[in-house]
């Protein structure tokens, strides 16, 4: 049959060998023709062999035409009643389940302006801007596609978090945003939900193959991009919504092939996306949503010029910027990208999450290893899965090995010297519970939704108090209580004053050595010369 002849060429996406198009003869027809998957490689959802291809209909990894046929047969059996109902789309009446318009956006019917202000105050939501939309109380009241609401429920989103209550309606009303919120408050879903709703609406009205992207999300690290894309896939399941991950460490040709075959969302790092745009002709004319996740980190890593270069290639998109902390550089970036943006702040982003109990211990550098061994062998104090932050890449490898030898625990390390596949596999093993401890540099300190983590250990203090806030925040997601154990000593003296203020605000105990240090009391922070002159 003609359909069967074109089956592999039209509906399998694969990593090309010497070009951007897959030769029909190279497609594996049968499962046994495919090799076994190596560590870190995608696996076929049917047989577990190397997932060389992507099934366009489901976005799942598959190894051959045979497994694709099995996958689609299962999908057809599971969704047959839904498929029958969906035939109504062909009638003259439009499918309004995807329609989202500013003028029919539902308000909270039973609340007047005073009650809205009271609600924002109770939820610690602060807004600044003109005609700010009212917050929503549930996902179903925001005009989202029914399938998206079901996906949210299946993913465990029972009701919106405070940041989602305010960001989702503001985004749906096509407003540009600058958002700051506590670590672990649900920022990622707050921008993915309106993106998926928008893309679904556009594609349902103009459904053709191989269309260019409608939205771009930029993030500072490969791990964060990977997680954002994975969450987008979960929330967009069953909707006309496909993604492309554009990060270093993965083959560029595969990323290009994916985009050329039609996607709605690009998630990537600025450097890799610039590289892709310079070497290949990617149509960005229809991109109307531009998201910057962890803006402060993007700026700290020197991505400002690259972000601006990508932005200038777009045609007046809606801009949404998210960060756990907002400083003058972030505000300057906001003013450059979006005029009249709504400023939304939830909680106190400059302080650790209130749900995290901070336990600061004075430990000399030579005693740190022994102290962490004691913690991890104590049933009372060790609450796996746990994340341990260190200051160096080699330190991450050495400490992970030492913990394994001393305690018998399964430990992995993650840092920038690891390949993308190694980092992805280590993170997968940690998130699935195969290992109970991950030792890492600051690469997991930003934005990652480590949902099961309830304990963080700062083996080495970070270089700034902002990074301290981010790393401590890994111990709590979505308001669930967690614990952060922090090792400090004289080497961290530049952070003593700010650290003490944070601990006082949180009502956390302060070690005697820290409280009595001359760097905490009486001597202002500054350069060595200023302290010398003061002491004289």
UniProtKB/Swiss-Prot annotation:
Residues 1-25 are annotated as: Disordered. A motif (Q motif) lies at residues 137-165. Its EC number is 3.6.4.13. The keyword Lipid metabolism does not apply. ATP binds at residues 181-188. SMART domains: DEXDc, HELICc. Keywords: ATP-binding, Helicase, Hydrolase, Metal-binding, Nucleotide-binding, RNA-binding, Zinc, Zinc-finger. Gene3D superfamilies: 3.30.60.220, P-loop containing nucleotide triphosphate hydrolases. It comes from Oryza sativa subsp. japonica (Rice). This is DEAD-box ATP-dependent RNA helicase 41. The Q motif is unique to and characteristic of the DEAD box family of RNA helicases and controls ATP binding and hydrolysis. PANTHER family: ATP-DEPENDENT RNA HELICASE DBP3 (PTHR47958). A zinc finger (HIT-type) spans 40-69. Belongs to the DEAD box helicase family. DDX59 subfamily. A motif (DEAD box) lies at residues 293-296. It catalyses: ATP + H2O = ADP + phosphate + H(+). Residues 1-10 have a biased composition (Basic and acidic residues). Pfam families: DEAD, Helicase_C, zf-HIT. Residues 168-344 form the Helicase ATP-binding domain. The keyword Methyltransferase does not apply. GO terms for molecular function: ATP binding; ATP hydrolysis activity; mRNA binding; RNA helicase activity; zinc ion binding. Residues 355-518 form the Helicase C-terminal domain. InterPro entries: DEAD/DEAH_box_helicase_dom, Helicase_ATP-bd, Helicase_C-like, P-loop_NTPase, RNA_helicase_DEAD_Q_motif, Znf_HIT. It is an enzyme of class 3 (hydrolase).
């Amino acid at each position: 049959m003609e359909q069967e002849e074109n089956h592999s060429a039209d509906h399998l996406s694969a990593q090309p060998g010497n070009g951007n198009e897959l030769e029909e003869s190279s497609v594996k027809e049968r499962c046994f023709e495919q090799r076994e998957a190596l560590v870190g490689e995608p696996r076929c959802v049917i047989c577990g062999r190397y997932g060389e291809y992507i099934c366009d209909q489901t976005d799942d990894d598959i190894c051959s035409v045979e497994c694709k046929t099995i996958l689609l047969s299962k999908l057809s059996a599971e969704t047959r009643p839904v498929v029958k109902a969906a035939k109504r789309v062909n009638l003259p009446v439009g499918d309004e389940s995807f329609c989202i318009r500013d003028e029919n956006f539902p308000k909270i019917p039973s609340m007047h302006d005073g009650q809205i202000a009271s609600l924002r105050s109770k939820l610690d939501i602060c807004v600044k801007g003109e005609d700010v939309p009212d917050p929503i109380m549930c996902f179903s009241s925001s005009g989202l596609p029914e399938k998206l609401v079901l996906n949210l429920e299946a993913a465990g989103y029972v009701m919106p978090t405070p940041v989602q209550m305010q960001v989702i309606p503001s985004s749906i009303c096509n407003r540009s945003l600058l958002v700051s919120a506590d670590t672990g408050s649900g920022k990622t879903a707050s921008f993915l939900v309106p993106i998926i709703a928008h893309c679904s609406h556009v594609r349902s009205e103009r459904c053709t193959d191989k269309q260019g992207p409608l939205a771009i999300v930029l993030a500072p690290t490969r791990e964060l991009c990977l997680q954002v894309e994975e969450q987008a896939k979960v929330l967009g399941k069953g909707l006309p919504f496909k993604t492309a991950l554009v990060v270093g460490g993965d083959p560029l040709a595969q990323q290009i092939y994916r985009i050329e075959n039609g996607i709605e969302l690009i998630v990537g790092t600025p450097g890799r996306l610039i590289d892709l745009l310079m070497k290949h002709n990617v149509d960005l004319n229809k991109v109307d949503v531009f998201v910057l996740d962890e803006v402060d980190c993007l700026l700290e890593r020197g991505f400002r010029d690259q972000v601006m270069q990508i932005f200038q290639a777009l045609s007046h998109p809606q801009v949404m910027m998210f960060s756990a902390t907002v400083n003058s550089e972030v505000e300057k970036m906001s003013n450059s990208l979006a005029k009249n943006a709504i400023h939304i702040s939830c909680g106190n982003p400059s302080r650790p999450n209130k749900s995290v109990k901070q336990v600061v211990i004075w430990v000399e550098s030579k005693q740190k290893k022994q102290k962490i061994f004691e913690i991890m062998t104590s049933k009372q104090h060790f609450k796996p899965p746990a994340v341990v932050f260190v200051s160096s890449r080699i330190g991450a490898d050495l400490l992970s090995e030492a913990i394994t030898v001393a305690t018998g625990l399964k430990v992995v390390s993650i840092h920038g010297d690891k390949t993308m596949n190694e980092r992805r596999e280590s993170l997968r093993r940690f998130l699935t519970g195969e290992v109970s401890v991950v030792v890492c540099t600051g690469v997991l300190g930003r934005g990652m939704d480590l949902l099961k983590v309830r304990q963080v250990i700062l083996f080495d203090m970070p270089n700034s108090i902002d990074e301290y806030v981010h790393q401590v925040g890994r111990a709590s997601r979505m308001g669930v209580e967690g614990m952060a154990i922090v090792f400090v000593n004289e080497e961290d003296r530049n952070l003593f004053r700010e650290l003490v203020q944070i601990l006082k605000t949180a009502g956390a105990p302060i070690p005697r050595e820290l409280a009595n240090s001359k760097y905490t009391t009486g001597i202002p922070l500054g350069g060595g010369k200023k302290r010398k002159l003061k002491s004289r």
